[in-house]
Regions:
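PLP-dependent amino-acid enzyme catalytic core
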Residues: 1-185
Length: 185
């Protein structure tokens, strides 16, 4: 599926190009050309990794579907304790979607654990071998989730910035103690 820039709808790129580039040349965001129609009934009963694979396959059409299945299965498996996308019964017919079962207990783990795999595959799809630097500015959970997702990913370096006194002490320590040869805080 083509993606276009929010600042130039005439410039279309593949999903691999959008993921590898991050922002468009004009400084815009890449958005999908359309939103696929999905058969919701066909998705019912799927576990979270299979559901995620079914959805991302609709958007990342230049990726190998088998890769996407493997990537979502490995991402949302053990690191999420088997509870990715877990619906907890509150009472009666009321449920709560628990988004804290990822490795950093932040909802951002859902994106930031899968994205590094998608970036590495995008670079492979495009034949790109240069290093990629991910820059993150945060005042909270994003920093730790990004550091955890991208740590020790080949060909990628990540640097996280946060304002002095702008995070809780726990968040600062989570970021400052992140292991990985390619991380900087």
């Amino acid at each position: 599926m083509p993606f276009f820039s929010t600042r130039d709808q005439n410039r279309k790129v593949t999903s691999s190009q959008a993921i590898a580039q991050g922002l468009s040349d004009e400084g815009g965001l890449f958005v999908p050309e359309s939103f696929p129609q999905v058969d919701v009934k066909a998705l019912c009963g799927l576990d979270y990794p299979a559901l995620a694979a079914a959805v991302v396959r609709e958007y990342l059409t230049d990726y190998d579907p088998a890769f996407l299945t493997d990537a979502t299965r490995s991402t949302y498996g053990a690191a999420f304790g088997g509870k990715a996308g877990y619906l907890a019964l509150v009472e009666g017919d009321t449920y709560a979607l628990e988004l804290w079962h990822g490795p950093t207990c932040a909802f951002k783990d859902y994106a930031l654990q899968l994205m590094p795999k998608l970036l590495v595959e995008a670079k492979k799809n495009l034949g790109r071998t240069e290093k990629t630097l991910i820059l993150v500015a945060t005042s909270g959970d994003t920093g730790k989730a990004a550091l955890d997702g991208y740590h020790d990913i080949p060909g990628v370096e990540i640097a996280v910035f946060y304002p002095t006194g702008g995070t809780s002490e726990i968040q600062r320590l989570q970021m400052a103690t992140q292991e990985g040869a390619n991380v900087a805080v």
